[in-house]
């Protein structure tokens, strides 16, 4: 497991209504913790696929996804390892835009996200639609770095950050839930930071 700098300077900010329970403000830092080696993804060969229970399975290459209408997220992110980072800006494309192109079959209820490394995570469909999720390639106006999931990652900022799969390459829509990597290893199936859904059995 790789750990990088940023797990210092803890500010608990008691009473701050932007800080979920059990979290600390990481300030200017952005800690990283991964269960695998950081890949160097080539944008010339990278693709993003949305398939499964959709009307039109679609794959975009790097140029193709950049040609879609852009969208940005400004707000906070929260990691299950207890850090939170305020006032982040990510730029990319809304997942809603991708699903408008592919269509969604009525029986779809969940999404299984897969990274180029084989990492997986599961999400309810409701957690990536209606302006809640993005495919992003910029952070604060600069290309997303590999250790933070670059060149492109999933962003689901209202859930703990392991749900925002780094090095994303596929979203498969399904009619059932299936646990991903961390979920199979004891982490919560949904991961709402405001409910402290860190581990299996949490509310």
What is the predicted function of each stretch?
Residues 2-203:
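Structured, non-membrane catalytic/scaffold regions adjacent to prosthetic-group chemistry
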């Amino acid at each position: 497991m790789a750990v990088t700098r940023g797990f210092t300077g803890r500010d608990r900010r008691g009473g701050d209504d932007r800080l979920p329970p059990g979290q600390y403000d990481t300030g200017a830092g952005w800690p990283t913790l991964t269960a695998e080696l950081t890949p160097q993804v080539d944008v010339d060969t990278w693709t993003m696929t949305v398939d499964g229970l959709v009307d039109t399975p679609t794959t975009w290459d790097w140029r193709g996804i950049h040609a879609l209408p852009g969208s940005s997220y400004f707000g906070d992110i929260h990691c299950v390892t207890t850090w939170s980072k305020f006032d982040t800006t990510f730029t990319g494309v809304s997942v809603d835009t991708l699903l408008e192109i592919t269509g969604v079959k009525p029986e779809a209820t969940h999404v299984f996200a897969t990274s180029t490394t084989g990492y997986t995570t599961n999400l309810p469909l409701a957690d990536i639609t209606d302006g809640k999720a993005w495919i992003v390639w910029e952070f604060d106006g600069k290309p997303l770095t590999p250790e933070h999931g670059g060149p492109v990652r999933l962003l689901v900022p209202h859930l703990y950050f392991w749900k925002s799969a780094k090095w994303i390459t596929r979203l498969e829509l399904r009619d059932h839930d299936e646990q991903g990597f961390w979920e199979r290893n004891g982490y919560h199936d949904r991961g709402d930071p405001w409910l402290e859904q860190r581990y299996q059995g949490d509310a």
